[in-house]
Each structure stands twice: as structure tokens, then as C-alpha cells.
Amino acid sequence: MNDAINHTACETLFTQARTHNGWLDKPVSDAQLQAIWDLMKMGPTSANCSPARIVFVRSAEGKEKLGPTLSSGNLQKTMQAPVTAIVAWDRAFYDRLPTLFPHGDARSWFTSSPQLAEETAFRNSSLQAAYLIFACRALGLDTGPMSGFDREKVDAAFFADNGWKSNLLVNIGYGDPGKLYGRLPRLSFDEACLLA
């Protein structure tokens, strides 16, 4: 049985963490990006399928490719962010299953059903995007996840050679608290949950 994390850790991960739109001029290192991956990869996925693939965009060239794919409301904050993670999914994720899930022939579950493969990859890469956000928060970084972009343009710009498919974007860095909006409300337990 696991011990509950303390209140401060819960604040860091959930109740005091915010989605940032403005960023301080402070870099994110290669070592930090590696640490993010090393945490997020440990989160559970269906049959350990681990379909997420990440492109950490931070160079001027990378930002130049990403810019035209963004909705107008996401352009400035993304260009300012030290890093933007493109969370994508690998259409051929199942080719890694003999290593990742050696308990049976899991690869055949997906090669025999392209629809199941796509649904599994998209669902589990979305789950892994959440792990990325919480890994960033655990490591003292802030995030700004976004879905306002043209997926086809991102795929053409970044994934023409490997067939990956973009899911969502996450800006990463040190957020500027002066550019935060007031915290928006959340649904109560009674509004969002049922007991069965």
C-alpha cells in the first residue's frame, strides 16, 4: 500500500498549479527534458503500449515551423515559451509491444484491428500527455496545454518521415505569475460524479 503524498505535494500537482499563458525568460535544459520523460514514461498505459512520442520544440527553426500551425490565440504565448512539447502518437506503437508487453502476442490485437489501434494510441497518448503535465509540475516547471492548432499542418511539418500523429501541444517553462488570469471554477463532486 502506498502512503498518501503530503498536502504541499498535492498543491504542487493540483490545487495551486495553474495553466500559464506568459513565460519568464528562463531556459529549460536538456537534463530537465530528460527528467520529464523519465517520470512520465512510468505512468500506466493499456498493455504498457506507451504510444506517445514527444517533440520538444525550442529552437528558432522549430518555432518557425510550428508558428503557422497555431490558432491566433495560441501564437504569442507559444513563441514566448522556452519549450513546446508536441505530444503525438505513433501509428505503429504496437511494433514495440514484444518488448514492452512480452506476456503474450499483444501486437496481433492491434495489427488485426486498425480501428482499435488508432483508438488505443489516441486515448493512451492523451493519458501520457497528462503524465507529462504532472511530471513538469513535480520538477518545478509550469505548463500550458493547448489543442488550438492545425493537426494536419503539424503532422506535415514535423512527422512527414515517421507517420506520427499530433494529439496536443504543451508549453513548458517558468510561468509569469503576473500574466495569470483569475482561477476559473470547477464542477463540484455532485455536479460531475455518480455513485453506482
Curated annotation (Swiss-Prot):
Keyword Flavoprotein appears in the UniProt entry: yes
EC number: 1.1.1.298
Pfam families: Nitroreductase (PF00881)
Reaction catalysis annotation: 3-hydroxypropanoate + NADP(+) = 3-oxopropanoate + NADPH + H(+)
Keyword terms: Flavoprotein, FMN, NAD, NADP, Oxidoreductase
InterPro entries: Nitroreductase (IPR029479), Nitroreductase-like (IPR000415), Nitroreductase_HadB/RutE (IPR050461), RutE-like (IPR023936)
Any GO molecular function: 3-hydroxypropionate dehydrogenase (NADP+) activity
One GO term (biological process): uracil catabolic process
Cofactor or coenzyme needed: FMN
Keyword ATP-binding among UniProt keywords: no
Enzyme class: oxidoreductase
Superkingdom of origin: Bacteria
HAMAP family: Oxidoreductase_RutE_HadB
Family: Belongs to the nitroreductase family. HadB/RutE subfamily.
Known role: May reduce toxic product malonic semialdehyde to 3-hydroxypropionic acid, which is excreted.
UniProt name for this protein: Probable malonic semialdehyde reductase RutE
Source species of the chain: Klebsiella pneumoniae (strain 342)
